[in-house]
A protein has these predicted regions:
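Short amphipathic alpha-helical segments, especially helix-boundary/capping motifs
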Residues: 4-5, 26-28
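Short aromatic-glycine-(Arg/Gly/Cys) micro-motifs in beta-strand/loop hairpins
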Residues: 12-27
């Protein structure tokens, strides 16, 4: 099975003030907030891709869950 952004587990929660948070456990520090569940998911997915791109730019390895997103054919 191919890895896709949808198959990377995202933890979700809602703060007392109503904001939603989303976190990707395999990428420490990748957490985002949004006014809705969907907005938080979208924000954390975009952040995860930015962090992965930065890791690649600096010659570092991306988490194994993201490897197939960037592997050559």
């Amino acid at each position: 099975m191919e890895t896709s952004p949808e198959s990377i587990p995202i933890a979700l929660g809602q703060e007392d003030d109503g904001r939603w948070w989303a976190d990707i456990d395999c990428m420490p520090g990748v957490m985002a907030y949004g006014p809705t569940r969907e907005a938080a998911i979208s924000a954390v997915r975009a952040l995860a891709l930015r962090v992965a791109a930065d890791l690649i730019d600096h010659g570092e390895n991306v988490p194994p869950q993201l490897e197939k997103l960037f592997s050559a054919a």
